[in-house]
């Protein structure tokens, strides 16, 4: 075999295979060029999902006539000279236009702001024609026809028109979020698919653009991010834990204005929500990272979708810290979508067979019992109300079954304070849900989910302050596991001991439990060990020690919290409400489920046709 130089056209086709995978990639490259040209209006038109026709026009600075040939030549660019480490533009390689022209029919028409007329140049299968005079407004128009007509085999890998159009809209949305001051529009065969008017280039304008794209639910459930560490600045918005999604498509990350899909950034977001969202759910977050260009390498992927940071630990720590602080500042807030879904679930149906139905038990003839709030529990914050030296057991014993004369309905005095965020307890229904009233709303609390969060936060506070005390089991328990699971769990033996959980090997595939945390009282050691073993493999590295410890705390909290089906006295319900108000991240349990739902009085009145 003879080694020979490849032709320029073949080189461009190879480059196109790396950069241009589908119509969305073509539009991405052209839109980024328009942004680099300081355009404030970008219009995109497509036919058949972009496979037959693409047109991108802008009102940017334009390209002079004598530079049009260079613009469609490989590795010709005005964006860098000799410093690849200091890239300040979205595009920089000079590959996009020649790559597109090698696999499609490309026509570029451009006019500078001070020119009398426009000029156009064409590239068909790598062959350049022109430039020649043309008529056009200041700016640039790029038309691409018959994508991949030179390489028909590539067309076999194209998806349906609808799928390609969906990929294009998703790509434009990602870019539009980062540039709210630019007007974007997308049309297909004379039909407008989406249009985003320009807004102010500030935080408020950014939130307005995000709301245009993400929907009206985003703003009331979002929390602003603003943090800085060394030379790195983080801004953007993240959402309440209970406002989550089943996939990560609603996570957007930008580095110096460039949309990226980086595992480090996704991992940092997941780590920040690790104890607030279920593992199969994903937070809704939009983050912008600005740092010196020399501190990030954007030239590590053909499509520039991945980046490499000089100090990844700094970036991860900044993201996790900023989100934790934002969630903490949010305090007792919950997502509005749960309330809306509850309202939607209400259906008005006439009650049938009222005459034949058995009359319900009436509480009117029964004595009412006032709420006797325990001042010490209401006024103390979480760390003080739970004496860790005596454990959580006294707190749990306080939440015991009520006396026989305690009724489900609670009479409150006229002077009872309703200005607490979660109000005053009024009733417990189905032995699991607490009904409370505020000045302008009704709140339903899941007592198990809420108490699970309280116990979890108490465990974490205790863990990071000092090792937890343990209690010896009178009869040690033997838990049978697979040999692999047992070996994996035993590698975390020292970490588990910090929680007061003492385990030892007991033959192949068996774990001997000698000690359990004293603060949890009596727990099901068998179930606890099996749950821990199921997850231990994922955290089987020293780098994830904190994640492992947090997971252990979450699992223990779940196994020791107040269970559904447990009756509570009025004072216990109110004490639980006050604890929720004092506890961080209390709007969700450790698994991401909501701990309470609020129905505004206006919504209730609307249900009954009063508004």
Curated annotation (Swiss-Prot):
It comes from the Bacteria. InterPro entries: DNA_mismatch_repair_CS (IPR014762), DNA_mismatch_repair_MutL (IPR020667), DNA_mismatch_S5_2-like (IPR013507), HATPase_C_sf (IPR036890), MutL/Mlh/PMS (IPR002099), MutL/Mlh/Pms-like (IPR038973), MutL_C (IPR014790), MutL_C_dimsub (IPR042120). It holds the Pfam family MutL_C. Gene3D superfamilies: 3.30.230.10, Histidine kinase-like ATPase, C-terminal domain, MutL, C-terminal domain, dimerisation subdomain, MutL, C-terminal domain, regulatory subdomain. Keywords: DNA damage, DNA repair. GO terms for biological process: mismatch repair. GO terms for cellular component: mismatch repair complex. GO terms for molecular function: ATP binding; ATP hydrolysis activity; ATP-dependent DNA damage sensor activity; mismatched DNA binding. This protein is involved in the repair of mismatches in DNA. It is required for dam-dependent methyl-directed DNA mismatch repair. May act as a 'molecular matchmaker', a protein that promotes the formation of a stable complex between two or more DNA-binding proteins in an ATP-dependent manner without itself being part of a final effector complex. Belongs to the DNA mismatch repair MutL/HexB family. NCBIfam families: mutl, PRK00095.2-4. This is DNA mismatch repair protein MutL.
């Amino acid at each position: 075999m003879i080694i020979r130089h490849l032709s320029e056209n073949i080189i461009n086709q190879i480059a196109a295979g790396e950069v241009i995978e589908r119509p969305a990639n073509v539009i991405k490259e052209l839109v980024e060029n328009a942004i680099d040209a300081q355009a404030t209006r970008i219009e995109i038109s497509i036919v058949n999902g972009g496979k037959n026709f693409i047109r991108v026009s802008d009102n940017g600075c334009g390209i002079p006539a004598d530079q049009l040939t260079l613009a469609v030549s490989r590795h010709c660019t005005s964006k860098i000279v000799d410093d690849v480490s200091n890239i300040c533009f979205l595009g920089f390689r000079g590959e996009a236009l020649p790559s597109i022209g090698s696999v499609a029919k490309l026509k570029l028409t451009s006019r500078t702001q001070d020119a009398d007329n426009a000029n156009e140049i064409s590239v068909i299968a790598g062959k350049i024609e022109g430039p020649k005079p043309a008529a056009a407004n200041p700016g640039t128009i790029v038309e691409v026809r018959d994508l991949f007509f030179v390489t028909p085999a590539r067309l076999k890998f194209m998806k349906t028109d609808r799928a390609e159009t969906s990929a294009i809209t998703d790509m434009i949305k990602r870019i539009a979020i980062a540039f709210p001051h630019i007007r974007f529009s997308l049309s297909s065969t004379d039909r407008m698919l989406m249009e985003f008017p320009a807004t102010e280039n500030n935080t408020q304008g950014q939130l307005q653009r995000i709301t245009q794209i993400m929907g009206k639910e985003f703003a009331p459930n979002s929390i602003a991010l603003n943090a800085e560490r060394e030379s790195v600045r983080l801004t953007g918005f993240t959402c309440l834990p209970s406002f989550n999604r089943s996939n990560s498509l609603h996570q957007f990350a930008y580095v110096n204005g460039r949309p990226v899909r980086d595992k480090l950034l996704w991992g940092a977001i997941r780590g920040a929500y690790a104890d607030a969202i279920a593992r199969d759910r994903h937070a809704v977050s939009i983050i912008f990272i600005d740092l010196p260009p020399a501190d990030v390498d954007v030239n590590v992927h053909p499509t520039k979708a991945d980046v490499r940071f000089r100090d990844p630990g700094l970036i991860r720590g900044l993201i996790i810290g900023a989100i934790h602080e934002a969630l903490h500042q949010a305090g007792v807030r919950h997502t509005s979508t749960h309330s809306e879904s509850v309202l939607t679930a209400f259906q008005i149906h006439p009650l049938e067979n009222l005459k034949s139905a058995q009359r319900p038990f009436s509480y009117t003839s029964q004595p009412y019992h006032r709420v006797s709030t325990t001042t010490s529990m209401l006024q103390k914050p979480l760390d003080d109300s739970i004496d860790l030296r005596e454990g959580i057991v006294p707190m749990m014993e306080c939440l015991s079954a009520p006396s026989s004369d305690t009724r489900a309905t609670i009479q409150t005095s006229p002077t009872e304070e309703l200005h607490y965020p979660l109000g005053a307890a009024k009733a417990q229904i189905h032995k699991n849900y607490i009904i409370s009233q505020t000045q302008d709303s009704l709140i339903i609390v899941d007592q198990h989910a809420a108490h699970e969060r309280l116990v979890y936060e108490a465990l974490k506070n205790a863990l990071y302050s000092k090792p937890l005390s343990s209690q010896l089991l009178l009869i040690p328990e033997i838990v049978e596991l697979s040999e692999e699971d047992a070996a994996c769990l035993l590698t975390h033996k020292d970490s588990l001991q910090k929680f007061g959980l003492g385990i030892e090997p007991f033959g192949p595939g068996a774990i001997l439990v000698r000690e359990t945390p004293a603060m949890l009282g009596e727990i099901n050691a068998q179930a606890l060990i099996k749950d821990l073993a199921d997850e231990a493999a994922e955290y089987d590295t020293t780098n994830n020690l904190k994640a492992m410890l947090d997971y252990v705390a979450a699992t223990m909290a779940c196994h020791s919290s107040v269970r559904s089906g447990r009756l509570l006295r009025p004072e216990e319900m109110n004490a639980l409400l006050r604890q929720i108000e004092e506890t961080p991240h209390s709007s969700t349990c450790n698994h991401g489920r909501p701990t309470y739902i609020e129905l505004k009085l206006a919504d209730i009145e609307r249900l009954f046709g009063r508004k």
